[in-house]
């Protein structure tokens, strides 16, 4: 490489890394994977080392990625919040160990190995045991104050527990990661899929975008979690732990959520064995892990090892190489969702990926196909996005055949032929035809599903037939099906026809929240539907609601319903065809069961823990909700009762600590009966 080429490449790489830093840290919308990003930074660092005359000025290789965004107050960390050096190489990990042994002149150094959580880095400050501030890493010197949003995280205590033998510092910055569990991420994506909305790519991006919402009510809709494992400023200094392993014990004793497991190791071989064991177990963790963090255990030795301007020299992240595969893209099919969103899907030659056979993968949307220049016939790289959803992340241009031409996204709906539209500010392309057969099928399937009014016998196959025959054009048509028509669907169908009609008739008396959920209002899932049912008590009242019924003086009137959801509900019922569906449901005799506002359980919040003698958790939940109560996942001072069975866990301990009434099944049934 000539000097001119080196200077040009350094400038090009600096611009690329800066752009990807902006997309990842500030917008939570990365366009490349960690592996590609780390490769760019590594190439830049190597060139800057080889050509120092062209490496003047601030380099992204020496800076912490900056996550500060508009709309938040900035707060200065009392102790700099660094990022970690990382590697994908076993050799480099062993060299890290050997360097510390050499520099500290110590054999037998002890290390702690922790899961590397794929979330958003945060620093939580406690003063005299009370939570006073939560701040993002920002640029390492100062970050965004997200205290109000962090307080919506149910697992994050506002006050530290006091424990025998464990000091409680006057001031401590405790560092960790905010994340979404895999279960919660999949729940949110299921809701979006039902609504025909584009799926989120991975839990990390969604968690980062959520914690930076300006409205904490919106943050509370997604069940963020936090795990804490590090420390910043500690006052007094005498309250510092002697080792990292000891600090983990303190974090747990204070009642804070910490890593599920960590390893200790002496020597490079033991470190590598622990990393491999962690890799084998990472699918069992509640959070996404993309590597292992190796830390020198002794805190005094950490201080001796010191740090660079960006990273501690006593820690390193070993990142697991992404599980990816190369295969050929045979076709692109476009699916139409319940709300008309067109989602492109890659049809692939089957390939093994993360222990499963993958033959289909998401292409996200029209813009992503164009940006990556993905063409039918290309050899593409497929990766599990966030270890969960298969996605096409790029193309192998070296294997592109001359006949592979740029993909042209459909200008008409592939199902009904209607010209597609793209609303301003949206990446989604939609079919605007409300009568599009696929949209009708998806809406009816959703309404009749177990999650909604639960019409037994009306599965996907039956709905397909009803729509194809022209007997069902919208949800209310379900209640006007004629027996004589259904009897024409085959021989000996009298019994199944009568059972279906009985199930349809019975569904007219389903719980109100099930009807609300069945309407498919954007952003309003089952939990929101239950809140709306308790508040409005009827479909017509909900359909006629005004903004002031949801938001008053910039505050939410209904628990769990923030401004974004309120506006989505109002927009839904402002559409004449949606309002007509409600009117028609009432006309055909639907009479939803309304939560009992006069019950002793009305307005009460329950938390369930352990195994009850006779009731399943679902049965107890259904009875509470039918009586106007609410079931929550976490215990707080606002909890009315904890319903506890055998083998009750930490929720029972927390209830006792907060003096929340604890009842058994017998007492619960007495409350339910009004006794």
From Swiss-Prot:
PROSITE patterns: BRCT, DNA_LIGASE_N1, DNA_LIGASE_N2
Domain of life: Bacteria
Domain BRCT: 596-675
Disulfide bonds: none
InterPro entries the UniProt entry points to: BRCT_dom (IPR001357), BRCT_dom_sf (IPR036420), DisA/LigA_HHH (IPR041663), DNA_ligase (IPR001679), DNA_ligase_AS (IPR018239), DNA_ligase_CS (IPR033136), DNAligase_adenylation (IPR013839), DNAligase_N (IPR013840)
Entry EC number(s): 6.5.1.2
Matches recorded under SMART domains: BRCT, LIGANc
Binding site for Zn(2+): 413, 416, 431, 436
One of the record's GO cellular component terms: cytosol
Binding site for NAD(+): 34-38, 83-84, 114, 137, 177, 295, 319
Any one GO molecular-function label of the UniProt entry: DNA ligase (NAD+) activity
Coiled coil (residue ranges): none
Catalytically driven reaction(s): NAD(+) + (deoxyribonucleotide)n-3'-hydroxyl + 5'-phospho-(deoxyribonucleotide)m = (deoxyribonucleotide)n+m + AMP + beta-nicotinamide D-nucleotide
Requisite cofactors: Mg(2+); Mn(2+)
Keyword Transmembrane found: no
Family: Belongs to the NAD-dependent DNA ligase family. LigA subfamily.
PANTHER family: CHROMOSOME TRANSMISSION FIDELITY FACTOR 18, DNA LIGASE
Name assigned to this protein: DNA ligase 1
């Amino acid at each position: 490489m000539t000097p001119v080429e080196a200077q040009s490449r350094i400038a090009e790489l600096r611009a690329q890394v800066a752009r990807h830093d902006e997309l990842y840290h500030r917008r939570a919308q990365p366009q490349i994977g960690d592996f590609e990003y780390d490769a760019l930074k590594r190439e830049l660092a190597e060139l800057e080392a080889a050509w120092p005359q062209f490496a003047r000025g601030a380099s992204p290789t020496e800076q912490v990625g900056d996550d500060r965004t508009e709309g938040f107050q900035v707060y200065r960390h009392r102790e700099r919040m660094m990022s970690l050096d990382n590697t994908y190489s076993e050799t480099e990990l062993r060299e890290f160990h050997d360097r510390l042994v050499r520099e500290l002149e110590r054999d037998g150094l002890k290390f702690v190995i922790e899961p590397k959580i794929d979330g958003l880095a945060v620093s939580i400050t406690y003063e005299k045991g009370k939570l006073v501030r939560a701040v993002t890493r920002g640029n390492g010197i100062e970050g965004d104050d997200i205290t109000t949003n962090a307080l919506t995280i149910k697992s994050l205590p506002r006050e530290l527990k006091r424990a025998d033998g464990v000091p409680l510092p006057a001031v401590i910055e405790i560092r960790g990661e905010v994340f979404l569990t895999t279960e919660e991420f999949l729940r949110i994506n299921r809701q979006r899929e039902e609504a025909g909305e584009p799926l989120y790519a991975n839990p990390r991006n969604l968690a980062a975008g959520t914690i930076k919402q300006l409205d904490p009510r919106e943050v509370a809709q997604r069940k963020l979690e936090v795990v804490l494992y590090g420390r910043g400023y500690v006052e007094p200094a005498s309250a510092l732990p002697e080792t990292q392993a000891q600090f983990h014990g303190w974090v747990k004793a204070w009642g804070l959520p910490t890593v599920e497991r960590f390893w200790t190791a002496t020597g490079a071989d033991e470190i590598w064995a622990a990393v491999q064991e962690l890799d084998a177990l990472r699918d069992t963790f509640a959070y996404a892990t993309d590597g292992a963090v190796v830390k020198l255990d002794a805190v005094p030795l950490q201080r001796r090892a010191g740090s660079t301007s960006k990273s501690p020299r006593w820690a390193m992240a070993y990142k697991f190489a992404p599980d990816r595969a190369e295969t050929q893209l045979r076709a692109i099919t476009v699916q139409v969702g319940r709300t008309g969103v067109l989602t492109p899907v890659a049809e692939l030659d089957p390939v093994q990926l993360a222990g499963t056979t993958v033959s289909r993968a998401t292409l996200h949307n029209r813009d992503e196909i164009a940006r990556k220049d993905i063409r039918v016939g290309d050899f593409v790289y497929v990766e599990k996005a966030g270890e969960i959803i298969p996605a096409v992340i790029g193309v192998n241009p070296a294997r592109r055949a001359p006949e592979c031409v740029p993909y042209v996204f459909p200008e008409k709906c592939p199902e009904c032929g209607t010209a597609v539209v793209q609303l301003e500010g949206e990446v989604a392309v939609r079919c605007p035809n409300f009568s599009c057969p696929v949209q009708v099928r998806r809406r009816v399937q959703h309404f009749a599903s177990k999650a909604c009014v639960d019409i037994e016998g009306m599965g996907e196959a039956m709905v397909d037939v009803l729509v194809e025959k022209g007997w069902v054009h919208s949800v209310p048509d379900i209640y006007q099906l004629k027996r004589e028509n259904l009897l024409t669907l085959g021989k000996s169908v009298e019994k199944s026809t009568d059972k279906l009609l009985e199930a349809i008739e019975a569904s007219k008396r389903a719980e109100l929240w099930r009807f609300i959920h069945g309407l498919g209002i954007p952003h309003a899932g089952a939990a929101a539907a239950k809140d709306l049912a308790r508040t409005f008590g009827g479909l017509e009242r909900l359909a006629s609601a005004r903004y002031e019924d949801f938001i008053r003086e910039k505050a939410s009137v209904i628990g769990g319903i923030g401004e974004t959801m309120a506006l989505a509900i109002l927009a839904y019922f402002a559409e004449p065809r949606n309002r007509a569906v409600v009117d028609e449901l009432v006309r055909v005799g639907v009479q939803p069961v309304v939560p009992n506002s006069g019950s002793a359980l009305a307005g009460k919040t329950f938390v369930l823990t352990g195994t009850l003698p006779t009731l399943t958790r679902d049965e107890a939940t259904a009875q509470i909700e039918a009586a106007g109560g609410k079931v929550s996942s976490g215990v707080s001072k606002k909890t009315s009762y904890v319903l506890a069975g055998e083998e009750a866990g930490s929720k029972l301990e927390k209830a006792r600590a907060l003096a929340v009434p604890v009842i058994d099944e017998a007492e619960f049934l007495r409350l339910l009966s009004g006794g």
